[in-house]
């Protein structure tokens, strides 16, 4: 246990970090159920939590409000703890359309989803780490409170094999099929197995690159090895191995048979109710759909929408909470909730929206009433299952303030950076004044964030600034996660200087190059101009030595006053600390790739953009000729499975087509 968790870092805790670390550790050792780390932007809250985890030596679940922040945290903890099991648990849907019925138009919408195979593998790897290891750190989103396969059924489906044990090949293959692995005779992919004589190759569903080879001799396991499925190279000989199921929802055969009997009984009961109410169409629909599901479960062991029978599959009573990731956590686990002022209300809001949709499906005969128990946790159930918890936020919400037994304050940054200076200027001349400020900041080589109240205003301001020769982009709600990361990356690299947004410039945007944050119409009281929103938005300039914030307002609202008072309180504390310890504030020099997961996407596009100048003077004929040549190269690389080269040429090809359209 001595070095269960070990941090790798060139830095030691500084500023308020040592005090905060000691306070949180003391609280955990004293048995406090809930604590809050009130840390300003850029104060190194992640580093503080890493030291708490290292000291406590306990498995940890970290929850973030969205996939973007979860990816950022995953990257940071992976760097701090390279020797430990840092895992990622978010929704594996790239696209998800839940099953729904609209009575007004008599429209039934079938469930439609696109599953990201890589994220599914990471989810399986996360639960495997919690089961097998004491040094697991799981970074998750609100997906952690949604129904997951029952851990007892999951553990009963494990396949344990040891060298020298008696094991019939047919039994192994039957077990793999029950675990939902599929047989193949071609190249081995994740979740598949292949048989050549007495050799069984298995590509575990939780593995990213390595497969397992089982060699049998006369019904005895003769050899077990880990190998590379691409090259066939043996990487390591193993004395024993445990193969985990392909999905969390795998269920033993006897449980399936029990479930079918319970579903049949509920179906008869529900049909009697519907017929008594003269709902004949609903009764016929329910009988047809449920009987089809029963047939599929008996034949295949699963069916489409099997999660709707999760109450029976996990052997629960009506209304009982579903099994979730929390059921896989060991009793001594820690729970860290990042940006808690957003994440806590998010957790509280998941249950009701899900319930309303499912009640309609039940009332109109699309699902049995037991489907209502396939749901996320209610907030009180989440509280019951939560181990010792630390909430992290620069602006803790009312729940954290009310329930925390200890608040560790982290106001002083290790870099000595002070909170931005805040000015208030009149609304009447806000656009012209902003233009003047933007030009000054650009001349210094820094960037600017501007936040507006409406989409229309953001669009108009972007157009106006662009017309006046300023390189500007608009970040709106239609931009997906990856594109949003690319836009932020381009801002940091200086591809453009001003980023305009509405409510997208708050939590977790790590941009040291931003020297000015401008908040237009700051005196319009509401969600976007609340005390928390203002403090968070002002904080976006806190990573720059010259960071400033300008609030355009004609009147001083209560939210503004409280936000300014809190910012000033922090500034005074930071300045006093710097003076006492002789610290000169230093800017944060973080490379773009350090901050953004998936930055390579933007990097490739930047490289392509750099080639643009050599094509600008080409004639349309020359461009067309080059486009045709690139198209042939692209398809040739794709046919040879050289997808990275094909993608690189594709970007250049699209750039040239765009150039040709302009001529």
Swiss-Prot record:
Gene Ontology process terms (BP): nucleotide-excision repair; SOS response
GO cellular component term of the entry, any: excinuclease repair complex
Ranges in coiled-coil conformation: none
Pfam families, A to Z: Helicase_C (PF00271), ResIII (PF04851), UVR (PF02151), UvrB (PF12344), UvrB_inter (PF17757)
Keywords, comma-separated and alphabetical: ATP-binding, Cytoplasm, DNA damage, DNA excision, DNA repair, Excision nuclease, Helicase, Hydrolase, Nucleotide-binding, SOS response
Localization annotation: Cytoplasm
Subunit-level organization: Forms a heterotetramer with UvrA during the search for lesions. Interacts with UvrC in an incision complex.
Protein name: UvrABC system protein B
Organism from which the protein derives: Legionella pneumophila (strain Corby)
Organism classification: Bacteria, Pseudomonadati, Pseudomonadota, Gammaproteobacteria, Legionellales
Gene: uvrB
């Amino acid at each position: 246990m001595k070095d269960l968790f070990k941090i790798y870092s060139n830095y030691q805790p500084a500023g308020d970090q040592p005090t905060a670390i000691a306070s949180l550790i003391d609280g955990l050792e004293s048995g406090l159920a809930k604590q809050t780390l009130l840390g300003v932007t850029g104060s190194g809250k992640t580093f503080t939590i890493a030291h708490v985890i290292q000291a406590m030596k306990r498995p940890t679940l970290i929850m973030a409000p969205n996939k973007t922040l979860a990816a950022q945290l995953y990257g940071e903890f992976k760097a701090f703890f390279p020797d430990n099991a840092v895992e990622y648990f978010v929704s594996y849907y790239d696209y998800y359309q839940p099953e729904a019925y609209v009575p007004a138009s008599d429209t039934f919408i079938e469930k439609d989803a696109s599953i990201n195979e890589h994220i599914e593998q990471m989810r399986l790897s996360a639960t495997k780490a919690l089961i097998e290891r004491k040094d697991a750190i799981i970074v998750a989103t609100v997906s952690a409170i949604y129904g997951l396969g029952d851990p007892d059924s999951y553990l009963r489906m494990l396949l344990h094999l040891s060298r020298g044990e008696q094991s019939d090949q047919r039994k192994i293959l039957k077990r793999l099929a029950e675990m939902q692995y599929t047989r193949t005779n071609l190249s081995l992919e994740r979740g598949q197995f292949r048989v050549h004589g007495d050799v069984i190759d298995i590509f575990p569903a939780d593995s990213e690159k390595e497969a397992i080879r089982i060699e049998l001799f006369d019904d005895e396991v003769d050899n077990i090895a880990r190998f590379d499925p691409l090259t066939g190279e043996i990487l390591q000989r193993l004395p024993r191995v445990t193969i985990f199921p392909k999905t969390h929802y795998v269920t033993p055969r006897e449980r399936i048979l029990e479930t079918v009997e319970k579903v049949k009984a509920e179906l008869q009961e529900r049909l009697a109710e519907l017929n008594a109410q003269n709902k004949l169409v609903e009764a016929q629909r329910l009988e047809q759909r449920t009987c089809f599901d029963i047939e599929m479960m008996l034949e295949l062991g699963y069916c489409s929408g099997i999660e709707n029978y999760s109450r029976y599959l996990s052997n629960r009573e009506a209304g009982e909470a579903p099994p979730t990731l929390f059921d896989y956590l060991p009793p001594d686990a820690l729970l860290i909730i990042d940006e808690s002022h957003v994440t806590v209300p998010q957790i509280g809001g998941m249950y009701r929206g899900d319930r309303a949709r499912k009640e309609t499906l039940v009332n109109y005969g699309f699902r049995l009433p037991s489907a209502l128990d396939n749901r996320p946790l209610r907030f009180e159930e989440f509280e019951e299952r939560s181990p010792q918890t630390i909430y992290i936020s620069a602006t803790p919400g009312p729940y954290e303030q009310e329930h925390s037994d200890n608040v560790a304050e982290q106001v002083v940054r290790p870099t000595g950076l002070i909170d931005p200076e805040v000015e208030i200027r009149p609304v009447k001349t806000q656009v012209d004044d902003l233009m003047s400020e933007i030009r000054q900041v650009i001349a210094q080589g820094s960037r600017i964030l501007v936040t507006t109240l409406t989409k229309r205003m953001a669009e108009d301001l972007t157009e106006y600034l662009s017309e006046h020769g300023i390189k500007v982009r608009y970040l709106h709600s239609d931009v997906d996660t990856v594109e949003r990361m690319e836009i932020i990356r381009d801002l940091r690299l200086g591809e453009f200087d001003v980023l305009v947004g509405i409510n997208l410039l708050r939590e977790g945007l790590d941009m040291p190059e931003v020297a000015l944050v401008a908040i237009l119409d700051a005196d319009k009281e509401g969600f976007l101009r609340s005390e928390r929103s203002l403090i968070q938005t002002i904080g976006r300039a806190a990573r720059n030595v010259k960071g400033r914030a300008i609030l355009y307002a004609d009147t001083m609202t209560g939210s503004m006053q409280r936000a300014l008072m809190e910012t000033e309180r922090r500034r005074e504390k930071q300045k006093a600390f710097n003076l006492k310890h002789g610290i000169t504030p230093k800017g944060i020099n973080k490379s773009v790739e350090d901050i953004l997961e998936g930055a390579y996407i933007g990097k490739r596009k930047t490289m392509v953009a750099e080639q643009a100048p050599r094509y600008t003077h080409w004639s349309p004929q020359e461009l067309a000729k080059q486009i045709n040549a690139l198209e042939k190269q692209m398809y040739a690389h794709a046919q040879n499975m050289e997808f990275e080269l094909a993608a690189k040429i594709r970007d250049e090809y699209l750039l040239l087509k765009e150039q040709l359209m302009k001529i």
